[in-house]
Structures are given as structure tokens and as C-alpha cells.
From Swiss-Prot:
The keyword DNA-binding does not apply. One of its GO terms (biological process) is aerobic respiration. It comes from Ectopseudomonas mendocina (strain ymp). This is L-lactate dehydrogenase. Pfam families: FMN_dh. Disulfide bonds: none annotated. InterPro entries: Aldolase_TIM, Alpha-hydoxy_acid_DH_FMN, FMN-dep_DH, FMN_HAD, FMN_hydac_DH_AS, LldD. Belongs to the FMN-dependent alpha-hydroxy acid dehydrogenase family.
Length: 379
């Protein structure tokens, strides 16, 4: 298959991956209305085309939390990334570092912190959930700090797992899940050899290091699910703020009041996110939630956004809506599944190319010039 656009990777990934893995990344919660709206609402954002502005020189670079970035894009934390390519977290991190942008390692990564951090020449970010096992949280924070992780991404929109019905249909969970996954792997021999055989171990590295024994897929569904903490409040985050001396970003903000609470708490940034439509179906898309949040807290902390971003044009739209930086999730997972590190590198090049086209045709010569002035106002 010819890859000519950033969106081409999805179809290629569906052909290459066993269904349980493709649908785990591709699916959302309940009937997946929010999942679809994330993409549709962003696609419906109209930009003002400007001409004759001498756009011969563009500057896509930016800076976030003291880190220089070649463009305002990072890779979001995605669980089980190492199941989509051999040692997938390492490959994705290398692609991000080569591009000069941050990579965020998930709590539930296959490759542990200690494997990924030394593989790249810039500090990575680390994502953490609030879990009942506070000992694990402290252990993970200590290891992230020791490995030189620069920014902590704290996910707060998962006090309980979302109802992801597609996982049960695909074999990721549900009746006879293990048998169905084996049968699917047998019909996808390229993945079975490259990842299933050569990509071992398939345990959850960060959790295994704490528990002292391998933590496989069944434990991911079991131990982690049992450890999500619905009693979480802002007060529970105070000890983490005291312990972590680097930038701290709160992921999962959709309401201006929560954004203001994050400012009061002392967060360095927030991520406007609905978990890619994987938690509560029916909530606002990130594109619709972002403008009100930007109006409430812009300038008081950094605003990042994810969910629904598939192209460089989408990046420009999110920046115009008020984001300082965006994070890619599914988009890079599809590319990783298709071609590993090279796939992610090519995706990022395509994203940059698409951004450049959008900036030239809207008259924005730098990231600072991508503002709400680029948006078509409702008449």
C-alpha cells in the first residue's frame, strides 16, 4: 500500500494487525459517538485562507517546559505500545527524539522506563495513573526521576475503566479471549513472528519491575483494573506535586472549572482530552471543549490537547483553537504497527509537511501566529 498521507496508516495497520490489537487502539467507549465526534468536529473547523503574504520562510519550532521542539507535537502515552511493533515504545521514542519532539511513556507500557530512557538522547515524559496501590505510584515516580524523565503526565480521567464493548467483540477481552487472540495471531504471521515471537517479553515492564514477577495481558485487565481509584481528589495529588520537582501536566481536562482547579493546584500544564473517546461516551470532543478552556486559563499554564488529531491540518486547527502543543495517539500507533520506527518518522514528516501547507495558506509564519484569528467566525 502506498502511504502518501498521514491518514493512510490506519487502513494499512488494520490489515497487518490481529483484530484484537487493531480494535483495542481503534475503538472507543460505548457506542463510540465521542470517538467519531473527535475527528468530525475537528474536521469541521474552517480556516481563513490568506494570500500574497510572502510565506517563503516558516518557523515551526517552539519551546515547552524549557524543552526545544521542532514543532508543537508530541507522542501521547499509549498502553501496550510494545504489542504493535517489536519493543514498540523504544522504536516510537527513537522516532520522536530524532524529530526533536517529546515521547511520553505509558504506565502500562511493555518496555519499562529503564529500557526506553537510555535509548534516546533527550528526556522523555512519563505518564502515571492514580491507583489504589500508592506504593506502585511512588516506585514508578522514583524510577522515572532516576531515569531522567523531565515531565510527569498525570492522567485523571480514569478513576474507573471505560465500557469498551469493541474489545469484547475483538477478543481483547470477553469469552475465550486468550484462545481468540492465539487464533488471530496465527492468521497474521508477520506480526506473530516480529512481535509475538521476537518482541518478547510481553509483560508490562513498569508493573513487573514493582511486583517482582511478569505481568501479562490478563494481569493488565485484572490487577490494573482493580487498582483504579474512584475516590481520587485534588488532595490526593498533593504528595505527588511535592515529590515530583519537574513539570507536572494534568491529562483529562474537558471543563473550564477543572482547568481553573488545575491552576489553583499548581499544575504546569493540562491536556484537554477525553481519552480518545475511550472513557465516557457523550462528552464533548476535545475540539469543542478547547476554546472555553483556553478562554479560562490561557497564559496561566500550558494547554496541550489530544483526541481526534490525525493530520498536520488538525494540528493547526487545535493551535488556532487555543492549544500550545498537541499530542498524537492513534496516529502514531497505526504508523508504528505498519513500519516501526521508520513508520513513525515518516508520519511525523507528513504531519510537518501538512502543517507547512496549512500555515502558508493561512498566512501564519510561526507557531505564535497560529491564533484564533485564523478561524472563520460564525456569521
Amino acid at each position: 500500500m502506498i502511504i502518501s498521507a498521514s491518514t493512510d496508516y490506519r487502513a494499512a495497520a488494520e490489515r497487518k494487525l490481529p483484530p484484537f490489537l487493531f480494535h483495542y487502539a481503534d475503538g472507543g467507549a460505548y457506542a463510540e459517538h465521542t470517538l467519531r465526534r473527535n475527528v468530525a468536529d475537528l474536521s469541521n473547523i474552517e480556516l481563513r485562507q490568506r494570500v500574497l503574504k510572502n510565506m517563503s520562510e516558516l518557523d515551526l519550532s517552539t519551546e515547552l517546559f524549557g524543552e526545544k521542539m521542532s514543532m508543537p507535537v508530541g507522542l501521547a502515552p499509549v498502553g501496550l505500545t510494545g504489542m504493535y511493533a517489536r519493543r514498540g515504545e523504544v522504536q516510537a521514542a527513537k522516532a520522536a527524539a530524532a524529530k526533536g519532539i517529546p515521547f511520553t511513556l505509558s504506565t502500562v507500557s511493555v518496555c519499562p522506563i529503564e529500557e526506553v530512557a537510555p535509548a534516546i538522547d533527550r528526556p522523555m515524559w512519563f505518564q502515571l495513573y492514580v491507583l489504589k496501590d500508592r506504593g506502585f505510584m511512588r516506585n514508578a515516580l522514583e524510577r522515572a526521576k532516576a531515569a531522567g524523565c523531565s515531565t510527569l503526565v498525570f492522567t485523571v480521567d480514569m478513576p474507573v475503566p471505560g465500557a469498551r464493548y469493541r474489545d469484547a467483540h475483538s477478543g481483547m477481552s470477553g469469552p475465550n479471549g486468550p484462545l481468540r487472540r492465539v487464533l488471530q495471531a496465527m492468521t497474521h504471521p508477520q506480526w506473530a513472528w516480529d512481535v509475538g515471537v521476537m518482541g518478547k517479553p510481553h509483560d508490562l515492564g513498569n508493573i513487573s519491575a514493582y511486583r517482582g514477577n511478569p505481568t501479562g495481558l490478563a494481569d493488565y485487565i485484572g490487577w490494573l483494573g482493580a487498582n483504579f481509584d474512584p475516590s481520587i481528589s485534588w488532595k490526593d495529588l498533593e504528595w505527588i506535586r511535592d515529590f515530583w520537582d519537574g513539570p507536572m501536566v494534568i491529562k483529562g481536562i474537558l471543563d473550564p472549572e477543572d482547568a481553573r482547579d488545575a491552576v489553583t493546584f499548581g499544575a504546569d500544564g493540562i491536556i484537554v482530552s477525553n481519552h480518545g473517546g475511550r472513557q465516557l461516551d457523550g462528552v464533548l470532543s476535545s475540539a469543542r471543549a478547547l476554546p472555553a478552556i483556553a478562554d479560562a486559563v490561557k497564559g496561566e499554564l500550558k494547554i496541550l490537547a489530544d483526541s481526534g488529531i490525525r493530520t498536520g491540518l488538525d494540528v493547526v486547527r487545535m493551535l488556532a483553537l487555543g492549544a500550545d502543543t498537541v499530542l498524537l495517539g492513534r496516529a502514531f500507533i497505526y504508523a508504528l504497527a505498519v513500519a516501526g520506527q521508520a513508520g513513525v518518522s515518516n508520519l511525523l514528516d507528513l504531519i510537518e509537511k501538512e502543517m507547512r501547507v496549512a500555515m502558508v495558506l493561512t498566512g501564519a509564519k510561526s507557531i505564535a501566529e497560529i491564533t484564533s484569528d485564523l478561524l472563520v467566525k460564525e456569521r
